Amino acid sequence: FRSSAASDVYKRQELIEAVKELELDEIVDILQNLPEERMNKILSNMSLVDRKRIEIGLTFPDNTAGGLLNTDVISVRPNNSINEVISYLRDQEELPENTDKIFVVNNENEYLGELLISRILTSKPTMLVREIMETEFLPIDAGLDDKEVATIFERNNLISSSVVDKDGKLIGRITIDDVVDVIREDADQNLLG
């Protein structure tokens, strides 16, 4: 009995460590397929920040933008200077994968626009975010069907896009690698189907 219990603890700890190495959207995909009790055990062993981020993803069906989103997102305020943004970015251990832009939000976390990394690098340090941010491209609604998300990415040649909830608050982003998975699944279904 003891060796079995010890083995279970070891396996659980091994699973928790393996999960920590995955992207948050991949963790959500795995957790959605586990029994609720096991999912809750894994969540309870995560940091509060990671748990909250994962719980956001778990609230959406996996065939929606919300199911694809990753909460590893960088956002800034419109009144920040470019110098402040650069300093903030340097303070990060690393940028999230496929970061080609950061998002601009107000104090209530409502999406206002996006700021391309290339614009940050080529703008004067004293300029304000609001002076150079892009506002034309609308964020993706979390409830949008994943195939429609793929179409938006394809049509606009996107690497990443913001995702907002029904109130327009930034809740994450979708990156091209997630969209490629949707395209592959759709192609496989069409091939078999």
Placement of each model-derived feature along the sequence:
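Single conserved hydrophobic/aromatic residue that forms the stacking wall/gate
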Residues: 1-6, 10
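Residue-level signature of catalytic and energy-coupling elements of molecular machines
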Residues: 7, 19, 68, 109, ...
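Structural recognition of alpha-solenoid helical scaffolds
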Residues: 11-14, 18, 22-26, 30, ...
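The conserved cystathionine-beta-synthase
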Residues: 19-23, 28-34, 77-98, 140-157
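Bateman (tandem CBS) regulatory domains
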Residues: 63-75, 128-137
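A glycine-centered beta-loop-beta connector
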Residues: 89, 102-116, 153, 161-179
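Divalent-cation
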Residues: 100, 114-119, 133-142, 157
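Non-transmembrane, extramembrane segments of multi-pass ion/lipid transporters
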Residues: 178-193
